[in-house]
Amino acid sequence: LMIRRPPRSTPLYSSAASDVYKRQSYYSFFGAKKSKKLRFNILPIILIVIPSFLILNQPDLGTAVLIFIMGFSAVFFSGLYLKWVVFGSSIVFISIPVVIANLKPYQMKRLEVFFDPDKDPFGSGYHIIQSKIAIGSGGLTGKGFMSGTQSQLNFLPEKHNDFMLAVLLEETGLIGGFFIFSIFFYLILISMHTSIVARSRFSSIACASIAVLLFLYIFINCAMITGLIPIVGVPIPMLSYGGSAVISLCAAMGFVLNARRQRDIKLEGIINA
């Protein structure tokens, strides 16, 4: 993991160890035995908490939150007693003030602007203001492909990355947004259904964790570009520019499709028998 320095990149795409790890973290429960007791789940929890803390110190709050929530969802799906899940959640909520108190100056600025973007309209609040204008101006049918004023005239920063969805909503409008979210919903639904019908416990938990990961990506990015939460740098799946993020997400969906295929092969064998 890269600590306290930006991730290395190439001219073709950016690559960050944390991007790869947040997809790998749903395998952390692999070392846990099939037990609801806490002592059998200590190793997976350690494999989630330590990297989350290190990534938080990069600082990369968005990625740390993704790894932490998605990793613990995997432990939860593995059958840990609910009381331990509630206990762990309570510790997280109690530690929120500590995390806020140790935020970097630019992160605190984002938090302040979140409550009042007009407080710094040409600084920290500029991104969210332009994003809202882009989304609102798209209307029902949008302005047309490559015809968005906020994106094409470069009013909207990071339009190829975290705010890619705002660009698409400006160009395609509410109708295009409905189509995009329908595809995302279908991917989540397929992942959850595969989790239910998977042949192995490992595949079941992994597919459920992938569904949680997709939901977190979509929810956080949508809330971010609409001003419901502060900007934390979480891209929209499959649409935002990126190297390792796109590859690892595709690998995750490939895992889901393979688990589903194995289940179909088993059913075909039963029918032919």
Where are these regions (language model features)?
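Juxtamembrane/interfacial segments around transmembrane helices
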Residues: 91-103, 115-119, 135-147, 229-233, ...
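TM-adjacent membrane-interface loops and short helices in multi-pass inner/ER membrane proteins
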Residues: 113, 117-161, 172-176
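Residues at secondary-structure transition points
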Residues: 7-8, 12, 155, 159, ...
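Glycine/serine-rich anion-binding loops at beta->alpha junctions
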Residues: 15-18, 57-59, 139-143, 234-248
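Single conserved hydrophobic/aromatic residue that forms the stacking wall/gate
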Residues: 1-17, 21
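A juxtamembrane structural motif centered on a specific transmembrane helix
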Residues: 221-273
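Hydrophobic alpha-helical transmembrane segments of multi-pass inner membrane proteins, especially
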Residues: 15-127, 166-226, 251-255, 271-273
